[in-house]
Amino acid sequence: MLGRDKKDIIAVTMPCFGTTDRTYQNACEMSKKVGATLIEVPIADAVNVHFRDIGHDPEDHSVTYENCQARERTQVLMDIANKTWGMVIGTGDLSELALGWATYNGDHMSMYGVNASVPKTLVRHLVKYAADDTKDEALKNVLYDVLDTPVSPELLPPKDGDIAQKTEDLVGPYELHDFFLYFMLRFGYEPSKIFRIACMTFDGEYDKETIFKWLETFCRRFFSQQFKRSCLPDGPKVGTVALSPRGDWRMPSDACVAVWMKD
């Protein structure tokens, strides 16, 4: 597969209610610069039909509003893959899987999760490496702008053209969550020990109250979102930490977080 022409990579952009011009233009420009085949499938009309079918008010920007978009995108990708004899490459990463920050059977699902064991902090380093390595100045600029763009699923309407839904404002800094995840999975440390190490590591960057707040969020989400990790597509194990239910992390979906919260 590594020997195939880059035009065999089908990049699909599916603008909808939350898409900003910045991310749309970056996606299109990046796809063209790397030599991929770009397809645009606007999904707003299809999602509005779905809203009518299930009786959902489009002005109700609840989780249903968001997840309908994510699942419509997955349906489009799956069907394009069937049509082109291809496979859907997942965009989710290890950090999102740990927090369950994905729509069940939406972006949570693919035919191969290539980033399944790559944490968000490493994704950023990889993008920067690609930007520094390329001789194409236009591509370099796009990649650096991607790094400067707030992480967002863009499922809620923008505010004055800017991203309104910022992931790290909602679930916390990924550098903290990736830190928590590593020490929990790699060494099996309990929350109290992870907290002490995090306070020393991030001294001067985050105060103890902030670290405690997001560690608590991490623990609650890690346990409550296991059901999404119990049915993951295949993906490679890149580092020492992964959450595959087949070879790395097996945990009942109804596991209780109470003991951890007491710690």
Which positions does each model-derived feature cover?
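ATP/NTP-dependent adenylation/nucleotidyl-transfer catalytic domains that generate, transfer
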Residues: M1-D263
